[in-house]
């Protein structure tokens, strides 16, 4: 079956194209131990653009995409954020992106297989029709679909379950690792037993939290930390002006403080962070995508003794001096993934959120006429909206709600 969509290929001049593609439907499994199942047809309704899409385009430009293509193919239909209509089931759904022969995709091991719709070995959502394993079609809450149409305000929020689920996993990991890192000291300080100390420590790690970078991932993790730990002192650090909509929205959602990084040196920025927090950070989360974040945290001392450094940025290389690192008892980790329960919780939380306010729409005809130009001049350029999405099939959208 042929359908029209955007796809990546290894091509220095045109790594991203829009046109007819032959759909494939290999059997896939959601988790290890479950049966391999052929996909059922789904029709994308609204699809969001993610930084991963831009990175895949650049990989195609460099000729590095072959491992990402579905088996036997020389292209990858991209797109992994959004809502689909499932004709066979007469319902809207969110695609669970990650699956494979793995007992837990958040901690997959070298002897397990792994795929991602729209990103890695499986075709994605920027297409008129796609095949999806029926075990990987997640339900949406009641009340948002009426007469076969989805409320636009809700649809906009549903381009975020993937990154929001990633941040739910980040919160879980920071609580787990932070608790393990701190609980013995906490037990001594609070004069309590070790199990009680673990519970205290899971919150204490966020006592002075830095979120370095203010994209949607930084905004989401700040919001989630605040919901889970109302007592946390959260500081966003970014380059946007204090009075910009993005900053005002993020600060309001997370009930956080903000520091504009206009400093001449990393040392000055580190000093300002500590002053704003009232001490060195207990938790430093890097989401800026730059190599500056780890230098400010580790080299210039914004991260305090016994602190944790969570690298969620893709691209930067992290280095540190092993002598102070060991004596300061720092914990550095990175983890990018999520489980189905994270995504299901993300759908529920997002449905009650205001995150539709940060989504801008690009006209489908404009996008498909020249997708590379849209990427470079509308979606991933200086001054671009925080989040861009495209209504792929307007027949399923009620723009009055």
Spans of features found by a protein language model:
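Glycine-rich beta-strand-centered segment in the early N-terminal region that forms part
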Residues: 28-48, 61-107, 123, 143-144
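C-terminal hydrophobic helical "lid"/dimerization subdomain
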Residues: 38, 178, 267-272, 279, ...
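Glycine-rich cofactor phosphate-binding loops and adjacent beta1-alpha1 units
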Residues: 180-209, 226-232, 244-331
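N-terminal Rossmann-fold cofactor-binding loop
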Residues: 237-241, 287, 336
């Amino acid at each position: 079956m042929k359908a029209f969509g955007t796809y990546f290929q290894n091509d220095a001049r045109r790594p991203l194209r829009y046109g007819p593609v032959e759909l494939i439907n290999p059997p896939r499994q959601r988790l290890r131990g479950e049966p391999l199942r052929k996909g059922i047809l789904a029709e994308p309704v609204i699809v969001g653009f993610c930084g991963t899409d831009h990175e895949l385009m650049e990989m195609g430009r460099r000729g590095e995409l072959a491992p990402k293509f579905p088996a036997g193919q020389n292209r990858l239909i991209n797109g992994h954020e959004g809502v689909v209509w499932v004709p066979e089931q007469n319902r809207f759904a969110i695609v669970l992106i990650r699956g494979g022969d793995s007992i837990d995709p958040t901690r997959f091991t070298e002897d397990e297989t792994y795929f991602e719709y729209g990103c890695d070995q499986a075709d994605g959502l920027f297409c008129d029709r796609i095949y999806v394993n029926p075990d990987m079609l997640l339900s949406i809450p009641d009340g948002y679909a009426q007469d076969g149409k989805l409320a636009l305000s809700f649809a906009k929020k549903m381009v975020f379950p993937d990154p929001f689920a990633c941040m739910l996993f980040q919160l879980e990991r920071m609580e787990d690792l932070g608790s393990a890192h701190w609980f013995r000291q906490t037990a001594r300080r609070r004069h309590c037993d070790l199990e009680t100390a673990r519970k205290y420590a899971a919150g204490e790690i966020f006592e002075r939290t830095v979120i370095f970078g203010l994209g949607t991932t930084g905004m989401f993790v700040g919001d989630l930390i605040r919901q889970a730990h109302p007592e946390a002192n959260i500081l966003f650090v970014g380059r946007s002006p204090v009075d910009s909509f993005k900053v005002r929205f993020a600060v309001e959602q997370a009930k956080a403080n903000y520091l504009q990084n206009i400093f001449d040196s990393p040392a000055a920025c580190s000093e300002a962070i500590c002053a704003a927090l009232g001490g060195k950070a207990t938790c430093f989360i890097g989401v800026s995508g730059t190599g500056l974040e780890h230098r400010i945290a580790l080299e210039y001392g914004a991260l305090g003794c016994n602190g944790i450094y969570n690298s969620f940025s893709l691209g930067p290389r992290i280095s540190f001096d092993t002598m102070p690192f060991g004596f300061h008892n720092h914990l550095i980790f990175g983890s990018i993934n999520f489980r189905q329960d994270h995504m299901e919780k993300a759908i529920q939380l997002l449905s009650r959120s205001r995150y539709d306010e940060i989504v801008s729409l690009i006209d489908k005809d404009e996008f498909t006429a020249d997708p590379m130009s849209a990427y470079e001049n509308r979606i991933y350029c200086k001054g671009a909206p925080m989040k861009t999405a495209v209504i792929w099939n307007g027949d399923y959208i009620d723009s009055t709600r």
